[in-house]
């Protein structure tokens, strides 16, 4: 039997991405297992991903703006020390989450994105970070649902939320690069 532990934390807490940063991001009070050898298998995240512009110009549904706190929707503007080389401010969390996943060699990362355009940016960012961390050959990066997926015989809207799925192969996950089934 395998123990499963769920933790939440702040990847923008300002510390470098390493095991001690993970401890800080996961609440500052490390579990005994984290003190000796920090190990993560899965990261699942639905970070704030709506741009300031989309939030303010009515692109974001009124029901979302009325019932979700702004901090859950729009990423904060952060100082230059933590600011990665991104084209879109709303992608800030993805950079830090993916960097953490590469440093910790996480087996599976699932990230919700606002639409396929953002999903493509996140997948591209993931490929760039994989090259930076020399882990290109280990990964399968996919966007689900795929742009060509159909729902009730009609094309899925590319403006709907999607998931970027990053799977590491060679770690007991031989089917890592199988495409998601619909």
Task: Please provide the spans of the model-predicted regions.
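Glycine-rich, phosphate-binding/catalytic loops in enzymes
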Residues: 23-25, 59-66, 127-129
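Flexible, glycine-/basic-rich loop-and-beta segments that form/coincide
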Residues: 167-182
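Conserved Class I SAM-dependent methyltransferase catalytic core
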Residues: 76-151, 157-168
């Amino acid at each position: 039997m395998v123990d499963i532990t769920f933790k939440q934390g702040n990847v923008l807490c300002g510390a470098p991405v390493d095991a001690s940063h993970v401890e800080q991001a996961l609440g500052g009070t490390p579990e005994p297992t984290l003190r000796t050898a920090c190990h993560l298998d899965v990261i699942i995240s639905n970070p704030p991903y709506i741009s300031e512009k989309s939030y303010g110009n009515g692109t974001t549904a009124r029901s979302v703006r009325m019932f979700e706190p702004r901090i859950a929707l729009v990423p904060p503007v952060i100082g230059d020390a933590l600011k990665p080389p991104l084209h879109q401010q709303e992608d800030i969390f993805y950079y830090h989450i993916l960097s953490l996943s590469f440093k910790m060699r996480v087996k599976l990362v699932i990230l919700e994105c606002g639409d396929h355009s953002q999903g493509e940016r996140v997948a591209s960012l993931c490929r760039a970070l994989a090259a930076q961390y020399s882990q290109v050959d280990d990964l399968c990066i996919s966007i689900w649902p795929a742009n060509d997926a159909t729902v009730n015989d009609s094309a899925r809207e590319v403006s709907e939320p999607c998931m970027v799925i990053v799977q590491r192969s060679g770690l007991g996950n031989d089917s890592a690069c199988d495409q998601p089934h619909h």
